């Protein structure tokens, strides 16, 4: 039986997902679907995902916030999973700045982000929405996105196992390398895959390096709250460490890497120049 391959992007909030979505839409055209509007009633059961793929025969790539890991096993379809991990505190800071720029005044998170400083907003999340603050990525990978209580080391173990089974693993701080790896490892299925991109939703004036952004966050939050945030996200920090090691292991096997990096950057620069000239 000939298998149909579908690339599925797990869009974790503020893990560079909008830029990945942009790259996928450009690469796959009409064969790509962002499906959050198709599934607006909570997490997507595996049976519904299979039904959706069966009903939309042109689809070769999907992106959404609501998919459950791992993807379903199916005799006809082969789901190739893509997910990027990010430093959890950097993700929280990015989420705050993004949320306060939104125009939806009816959203309680938008209202609170606009009204509160970063530390006060994070404390508000701690009180009212801990599922948006504590070990979010461990919850997504290790507990199918369900959050009735904070994830445990048991869920971390499951998250790491799930991470290691991803067809495409990326680290936000090595974003270009992650997409280069995706192009390389998926070429047997998608031989012409081009994931060059133009960055989306980048905060104006954002410090360039992770260390600079974390220093900025520590100054704003103070040492005491910053240490608490690290403690509240200890599982995500361990997941990131394991993810970085697994990504490095995979990346070392890609041949001619410096040439690939140069060519990928040139493609991205060309896209950016085209957009600026338009």
Where would I find each of the regions flagged by the language model?
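N-terminal pre-catalytic "stem/leader" segment of glycosyltransferase-like enzymes
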Residues: 7-37, 43-44
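Aromatic-acidic/polar surface patches that form glycan- and anion
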Residues: 2, 10-13, 17, 55, ...
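Viral RNA-dependent RNA polymerase
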Residues: 4, 14-15, 86, 103
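Membrane-proximal basic amphipathic "stem/tether" segments
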Residues: 1, 262-278
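PAPS-dependent sulfotransferase catalytic domain
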Residues: 34, 41-84, 90-199, 215-216
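PAPS-dependent sulfotransferase catalytic core
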Residues: 46-47, 63-70, 195-268
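Non-transmembrane alpha-helical segments in soluble domains
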Residues: 21-25, 167, 179-183, 237-244
């Amino acid at each position: 039986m000939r298998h149909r391959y579908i690339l599925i992007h797990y869009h974790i909030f503020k893990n560079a997902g909008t830029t990945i979505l942009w790259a996928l839409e450009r690469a796959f055209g009409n064969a790509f679907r962002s499906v959050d509007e198709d599934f607006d009633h909570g997490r997507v059961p595996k049976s519904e995902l299979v039904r959706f793929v069966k009903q939309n025969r042109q689809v070769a790539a999907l992106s959404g916030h609501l998919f459950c890991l791992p993807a379903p096993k199916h005799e006809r379809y082969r789901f190739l999973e893509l997910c990027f991990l990010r430093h959890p505190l950097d993700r929280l800071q990015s989420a705050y700045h993004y949320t306060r720029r939104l125009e939806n005044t009816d959203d309680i998170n938008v209202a609170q982000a606009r009204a509160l400083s970063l530390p006060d907003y994070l404390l508000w999340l701690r009180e009212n929405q801990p599922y948006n603050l504590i070990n979010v990525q461990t919850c997504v990978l290790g507990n199918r996105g369900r959050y009735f209580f904070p994830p445990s080391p048991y869920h971390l173990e499951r998250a790491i196992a799930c991470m290691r089974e991803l067809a495409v693993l990326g680290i936000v701080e090595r974003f270009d390398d992650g997409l280069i790896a995706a192009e390389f490892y998926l070429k047997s299925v998608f031989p012409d895959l081009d994931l060059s991109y133009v960055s989306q939703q980048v905060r104006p004036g954002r410090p360039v390096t992770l260390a600079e952004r974390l220093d900025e966050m520590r100054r704003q939050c103070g040492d005491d709250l910053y240490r608490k945030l690290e403690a509240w996200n200890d599982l995500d920090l361990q997941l990131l460490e394991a993810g970085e090691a697994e990504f490095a292991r995979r990346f070392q096997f890609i041949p001619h890497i410096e040439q690939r990096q140069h060519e990928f950057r040139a493609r991205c620069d060309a896209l950016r120049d085209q957009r600026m000239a338009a």
